[in-house]
Amino acid sequence: MVLPKSMRIKGYKSFDYLHKTGLRYNSSSMLLKVAKANSRLIKSKLSDSKFINSTRCAISISNKVSKRAVVRNQLRRMLHDYLKAKLANIPTNQNLWLLFSLRPSSLNKDPKELLKEMDTLISKARIFND
């Protein structure tokens, strides 16, 4: 399953904001950018402010990872499922935007290794209060 709409980052302005202001955390096959939420960039039909000021995520997988959309979508779905479970543990007072970008080397890795790398990036960024 994919992330709910209230947890997704959408729009090129939001991605530009993340690329310009986000803190960068690297691993061998993944990149994490973390920035404080900017509610002015969200166009939401949901009038409830708890959705506007919540933690949001995006996963970016370029054509360099795989030319086949099926493969990219499988990776994206796997990472979305994992993130959905992890986001339940984020404190509600943290309004963060997370952008995970996969590198071409990620295609050769085992899915368990990718999830482990995602965990290490999240712990480097100190997102959770575990």
From Swiss-Prot:
This enzyme's EC code(s): 3.1.26.5
Transit peptide keyword on record: no
Keywords: Endonuclease, Hydrolase, Nuclease, RNA-binding, tRNA processing
Gene Ontology terms: biological process: tRNA 5'-leader removal
Record InterPro entries: Ribosomal_Su5_D2-typ_SF, Ribsml_uS5_D2-typ_fold_subgr, RNase_P
GO molecular function: 3'-tRNA processing endoribonuclease activity; ribonuclease P activity; tRNA binding
HAMAP family in alphabetical order: RNase_P
PANTHER family referenced in this protein's UniProt entry, alphabetically: RIBONUCLEASE P PROTEIN COMPONENT
Similarity comment: family membership: Belongs to the RnpA family.
UniProt protein name: Ribonuclease P protein component
Organism: Prochlorococcus marinus (strain MIT 9211)
